[in-house]
Structure formats: structure tokens, C-alpha cells
Amino acid sequence: MQGFNMGKYIPPEGPNAKRKFDKLRNVIRFEMPFPVWCNNCENIIQQGTRFNAVKKEIGSYYTTKIWSFSLKCHLCSNPIDVHTDPKNTEYIVASGGRRKIEPQDINERPAKAENDEKVPSDAIEALETQLTQQKSEKHNSSVINFIYEKNERLWSDPFVSSQRLRKQFRERKKIEKKQEAKDLSLKNRAALDIDILPPSSSDKDKALLLLDNELGKNKFIRKLDYRRTLMPSSRTFSTFAKFAETSFAKKDPFARKFVPSEKLRSEQRKFPTENLKGEKILEDNSVSLVNYEVSDDEG
């Protein structure tokens, strides 16, 4: 008699797929070979800390395999990958962290020659190398002599040189204090609690672009003189009428005619002019034009 569920087909993506995948992974006990800084939590993982790492082969150096150890930080669960380096016989942190440099690591490194150049293989190459070195030494000698002569010329009289430097420092200090006062007044006016950096060329270009854009949007507003519109004179109304005919008429061809009231007519008779044209009327957030004439004969 067959048992329960015997002979039943279970697909690879079934409920046992995860358990099968876990069996394929090579999980080992890995010990950190050196101190490592975590890039996520900025904490240090000390040397000798042990982890459950996934070991897998990622390449080879000649016939030596290169292994990768994937682990997670014990403080923030940040994934860290450590690879073997067969060429230099050490480990490297590939991602997720960085190695902490210690003094003993510097002392253990092999010393390198100051002029780590390849040895010439023949006499012609050796001669070319010698000529190049002589040319370089001659150039360096001329530069050193120039610097020495310049220092001797500038500091031939220490008192005059010191006086000149103090004068430059005083002028620079005055400029800095003046700029600091300007920045402080700006911070007080704008209620800022940040440091104001000196302006740059890019800031100036951006400000000009913003200004041009803003002036372009408000072109018809800039033409209007608000001080003159507030003055109770006929010249004000005539100026605004001329502006309204050239500006608002183009934008609103279906402007409504406005019939002035009796009170407005009585006020307009006080003006010394004969013709009054144009007045802006705002009703329900809309702009309407006025184009009418009032003569002295009307009663």
C-alpha cells in the first residue's frame, strides 16, 4: 500500500523550491581578516568578527580560483562583499564597505624606489634616458635659481617688505569688514540664519535670466506709471487711455463699453480737458475697456 502523497509531482517553483535553493548555496563561517568600515551605518567591523557568508566562485587568476564571500553587517544588515586577491595574496572589500588603514599595514607594505622606472635594455636606450635626465635637471635648476633670485630681490630690505605686506593686510581687512557688514544687514533684513557666500559668475548669469523672464512677463505692467494714475488730473486719465488702447485692446478685443454714471460725469467736468478716454474696470476678475468722450455741452 502506498503512503500519503507518494508519487505526487512537485514543480520546481512549488513550496519546496526555497528549501532546494538553500541547499544549493554554500554557506560557510567567515571571519573578517581586517577591520572594515560599513558604508551604511559608518560603524567599524573589527578584525576577527565571524559571519555566515555565502561563498561562490567569481573568476580565476591563472589556475587559482577567485572566491567571493557575501555577508551582512551585524549592526544594520548592509550587504558586504569580500573577494580574494590571489595576485597580491590578500583580501579586498568589493562593495558595501571599505578597509580601515592601520599603521602596521603601511609598515608591512614593500618599499618602492623613488624612480621606479624600467631598466634600459640596450646602450641606445640608456643614452636617451641619460639625456632626458640631464635635460630635466637643467630645467629644474633654472626654476630653482629663478625662485631664489626673486626672493632675494623681494626681501632685500626686510623693513620695506614687511611694511608692504602690512599695508596689503590692512586693505584686505577693510574690504572683508565692509563685506561682512553688508552680509549682516542682509541677514537681518531677510531674517536669515545661514552664511552668505560671495557671489560667483554663475550666480550673476542666473539672476539675469530670472530678471529677464520676470520683466518679459510683466512688460505691460512696467509701462504703467502708478504714481501718475493716482493723481486726480486729466493728464492721468489721458495717459492711461493711450496705454489702454495700445495694450489692453490687443489682449481683449471683445471689451465691453462702459456708460459712466451721473456722479462720474460730474467729477469729470472738473477736469480742464474736453475729451477723456479710457479707464480700467475690474469686474469678476476681468478687464474691460472704456472709450468714451465727454464734452462741455452735455448737461
UniProtKB/Swiss-Prot annotation:
Residue ranges that the Swiss-Prot or TrEMBL entry lists as coiled coil: none
Subcellular location: Nucleus
Plastid found in the keyword field: no
Cellular component terms (Gene Ontology): nucleus; post-mRNA release spliceosomal complex; spliceosomal complex; U2-type spliceosomal complex
Keyword flag Iron: no
Main location: nucleus
Family: Belongs to the CWC16 family.
Name assigned to this protein: Protein saf4
Source organism of this protein record: Schizosaccharomyces pombe (strain 972 / ATCC 24843) (Fission yeast)
Protein's gene: saf4
